[in-house]
Protein backbone atom coordinates (compact mmCIF):
# COMPACT_ATOMS: atom_id res chain seq x y z
CA UNK A 1 0.00 0.00 0.00
CA UNK A 2 1.47 3.38 -1.02
CA UNK A 3 1.83 6.09 1.61
CA UNK A 4 1.87 9.79 0.81
CA UNK A 5 2.84 12.84 2.82
CA UNK A 6 0.21 15.49 2.18
CA UNK A 7 1.35 19.00 3.03
CA UNK A 8 -0.49 22.32 2.78
CA UNK A 9 1.42 25.57 3.30
CA UNK A 10 -0.17 29.02 3.55
CA UNK A 11 1.25 32.47 4.17
CA UNK A 12 -0.03 34.40 7.17
CA UNK A 13 -0.77 38.13 7.36
CA UNK A 14 1.55 40.26 9.49
CA UNK A 15 0.71 40.00 13.22
CA UNK A 16 -1.66 37.04 12.63
CA UNK A 17 0.67 34.10 13.36
CA UNK A 18 -0.84 33.41 16.81
CA UNK A 19 -4.34 33.35 15.35
CA UNK A 20 -3.19 31.15 12.46
CA UNK A 21 -1.62 28.69 14.91
CA UNK A 22 -4.83 28.61 16.97
CA UNK A 23 -7.01 27.91 13.92
CA UNK A 24 -4.76 25.21 12.47
CA UNK A 25 -4.16 23.41 15.77
CA UNK A 26 -7.93 23.33 16.34
CA UNK A 27 -8.33 21.87 12.85
CA UNK A 28 -5.66 19.28 13.65
CA UNK A 29 -7.64 18.25 16.76
CA UNK A 30 -10.81 17.86 14.70
CA UNK A 31 -8.90 15.86 12.09
CA UNK A 32 -7.65 13.52 14.85
CA UNK A 33 -11.15 13.15 16.37
CA UNK A 34 -12.77 12.31 13.04
CA UNK A 35 -10.06 10.16 11.45
CA UNK A 36 -7.92 8.86 14.31
CA UNK A 37 -4.86 10.21 12.47
CA UNK A 38 -2.42 12.95 13.37
CA UNK A 39 -2.00 16.19 11.47
CA UNK A 40 1.18 18.10 12.28
CA UNK A 41 1.16 21.90 12.30
CA UNK A 42 4.37 23.90 11.98
CA UNK A 43 5.76 27.29 11.10
CA UNK A 44 9.04 28.11 9.39
CA UNK A 45 12.16 28.95 11.39
CA UNK A 46 14.34 31.32 9.41
CA UNK A 47 13.35 32.59 6.01
CA UNK A 48 9.69 33.61 6.09
CA UNK A 49 8.32 32.78 9.55
CA UNK A 50 4.83 33.89 8.50
CA UNK A 51 3.87 30.58 6.96
CA UNK A 52 1.86 27.73 8.45
CA UNK A 53 2.25 24.17 7.24
CA UNK A 54 -0.20 21.34 7.94
CA UNK A 55 1.10 17.86 7.21
CA UNK A 56 -0.36 14.37 7.42
CA UNK A 57 0.43 10.85 6.27
CA UNK A 58 -2.23 9.29 4.05
CA UNK A 59 -2.71 5.99 2.27
CA UNK A 60 -2.97 6.57 -1.45
CA UNK A 61 -6.07 4.39 -1.86
CA UNK A 62 -7.91 6.35 0.88
CA UNK A 63 -6.84 9.83 -0.18
CA UNK A 64 -10.26 11.48 -0.32
CA UNK A 65 -11.95 9.70 2.60
CA UNK A 66 -10.42 11.81 5.38
CA UNK A 67 -11.10 15.07 3.55
CA UNK A 68 -14.74 14.10 3.07
CA UNK A 69 -15.13 13.45 6.80
CA UNK A 70 -13.58 16.70 7.98
CA UNK A 71 -15.04 19.00 5.33
CA UNK A 72 -18.57 17.94 6.36
CA UNK A 73 -17.94 18.79 10.02
CA UNK A 74 -19.61 22.07 11.18
CA UNK A 75 -16.72 22.97 13.54
CA UNK A 76 -14.23 22.48 10.69
CA UNK A 77 -16.36 24.64 8.38
CA UNK A 78 -16.47 27.42 10.98
CA UNK A 79 -12.68 27.34 11.33
CA UNK A 80 -12.33 27.50 7.53
CA UNK A 81 -14.35 30.74 7.58
CA UNK A 82 -11.88 32.17 10.10
CA UNK A 83 -9.06 31.83 7.54
CA UNK A 84 -10.19 35.10 5.91
CA UNK A 85 -7.97 37.97 7.04
CA UNK A 86 -5.52 35.57 8.73
CA UNK A 87 -4.11 33.69 5.75
CA UNK A 88 -3.02 35.53 2.61
CA UNK A 89 -5.36 34.77 -0.31
CA UNK A 90 -3.73 32.94 -3.20
CA UNK A 91 -0.75 31.62 -1.23
CA UNK A 92 -1.99 28.10 -0.48
CA UNK A 93 0.38 25.44 -1.84
CA UNK A 94 -0.53 21.75 -1.65
CA UNK A 95 2.12 19.10 -2.05
CA UNK A 96 1.92 15.30 -2.09
CA UNK A 97 5.11 13.30 -1.67
CA UNK A 98 5.42 9.55 -2.15
CA UNK A 99 7.15 7.87 0.83
CA UNK A 100 9.88 5.53 -0.39
CA UNK A 101 11.10 4.14 2.95
CA UNK A 102 7.88 3.53 4.90
CA UNK A 103 8.52 1.20 7.87
CA UNK A 104 6.48 -1.99 7.83
Task: Give residue ranges: language-model regions.
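Short hydrophobic/aromatic segments of transmembrane alpha-helices and their interfaces
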Residues: 1-2, 46, 59
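Short acidic/glycine-enriched loop/turn segments that link adjacent beta-strands
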Residues: 47-51
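Active-site-flanking beta-strand signature of metal-NTP-handling nucleotidyl enzymes
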Residues: 3-11, 53
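Short, low-order "capping/linker" segments at domain edges
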Residues: 92-104
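N-terminal secretory/targeting leader peptides
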Residues: 41-42, 52
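An amphipathic, aromatic/His-enriched active-site/gating alpha helix that lines ligand/cofactor pockets
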Residues: 25-41, 57-94
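Short, surface-exposed ligand-recognition loops at beta-strand->loop->(often short) alpha-helix junctions
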Residues: 11-22
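Non-catalytic surface loops within mature trypsin-like serine protease
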Residues: 12-14, 58-62, 100-102
Amino acid sequence: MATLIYRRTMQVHMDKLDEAMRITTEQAKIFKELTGKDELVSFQVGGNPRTICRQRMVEMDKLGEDDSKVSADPKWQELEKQHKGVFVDGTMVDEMRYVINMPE
